[in-house]
Amino acid sequence: MKDYTYSVTEINEYIKDLIEGDPYLTNVSVYGEISGVRPRKGHIFFSLVEENARLECVIFGGDNMGIRLQEGRMALVEGSVSVYIPHGTYRFICSNVRYLDQAGMYQIKFETTLKKLLEEGLLSRPKKTVPRFPRKIGIITSRDSAALQDVIRTARERKAPIEIYVFHTSVQGDSAREELIKALRKANEYDLDLVMIVRGGGSKEDLWGFNEEDVIREILKLRHPVVTGIGHEIDRVIADFVADVSMHTPTGAAEYVIPDASEIHEDLDSFLEKLIASLSNRFDMEERRLETLYFRLRMIGRRKLELNEFKIERVKELAAKLRKKLMDCFEQDQEKLESLGRMLESLNPLRPLERGFVLVKKEGEIVKESSDLKRGDVVSLVFKDGTKKAQVIG
């Protein structure tokens, strides 16, 4: 370090050159709350404040231009940082002031957070694959929300053999941020096939919890694939950008994630057809190979056969091994067919009736809870061998 003594002016001038020569402090935009407006000698001095910080600002000639700043208003100011050498202070020289409403504030925060995540490469990370036939699905939403009912209704309509785990959280309001983080962390502890994050539509303020940086970073920590269905068609939150799959609505997300039972049957039928065709082709091919070997052996003269008896034995050994290999393959494929059969049988809704259970229907609909019935209701009792009518007496 040089052995040199600076004057106050030299230090301030050096700092001025550093700050005013920094492109990140020139022609930039800053937002905050207007405070301490002080017109003086044709200029307007004021502060931009937020919870734990303050930035001194000035509009040169602003008073003469008829500019009137309002205390307490949120504003976006444009300009550059400058150093005032006589006092050794810095301030923001404003070239333009624009008031912000609540929507404007949310939009600025949205863009700022999105840009930060983009610069960190978090929006371009590889996407996880969403399983086609999930069995365990976690849902992060309010237990009282219409979004949850949309997902449950879709699951019932599709008759899919799935387990649903609900991780309750507020989806709007002051507590949404902390509760969403807790729900995400809880879901990460479970052995799930995927996680759905859903809620219905609303204003930017209602949906803001899904734009909070802390919430987004917690979503990125999930071990499971993430599917979002937040808001309506026009709504877009930052959680959608980091999800592995993003749908426009809760119902859309549910339809994407939950397979239809008919699709499962179709896939099984297709697999069985391909398996049978593959086995048939394999047997045909091996049969032709054996016929070819047999024909070649017949063409060989007796004398040559006697001289090459060991070759014949070798062919027999190979044929035996081939036969054994075919039988092993057949047994393996038979096990697969039996497994598929058991899976199809487990999907049969009438299976429990063979064990003595009774299916209760009211007006053609299955009764799932006792609260769905009242005294005097006429119901149908479905046994394994027929149906009987009954009346609720208590």
Swiss-Prot record:
Compartments it resides in: Cytoplasm
GO molecular-function term, one example from the UniProt record: exodeoxyribonuclease VII activity
Reactions that this protein is recorded to catalyse: Exonucleolytic cleavage in either 5'- to 3'- or 3'- to 5'-direction to yield nucleoside 5'-phosphates
Cellular compartments per GO CC: cytoplasm; exodeoxyribonuclease VII complex
Signal peptide range in chain numbering: none
InterPro entries: Exonuc_VII_L, Exonuc_VII_lsu_C, OB-fold_nuc-bd_dom
Domain of life: Bacteria
Gene Ontology BP annotations: DNA catabolic process
Entry EC number(s): 3.1.11.6
Summary of subunit composition and partner proteins: Heterooligomer composed of large and small subunits.
Family affiliation: Belongs to the XseA family.
Its biological purpose: Bidirectionally degrades single-stranded DNA into large acid-insoluble oligonucleotides, which are then degraded further into small acid-soluble oligonucleotides.
UniProt-recorded name of the protein: Exodeoxyribonuclease 7 large subunit
Organism phylogeny: Bacteria, Thermotogati, Thermotogota, Thermotogae, Thermotogales
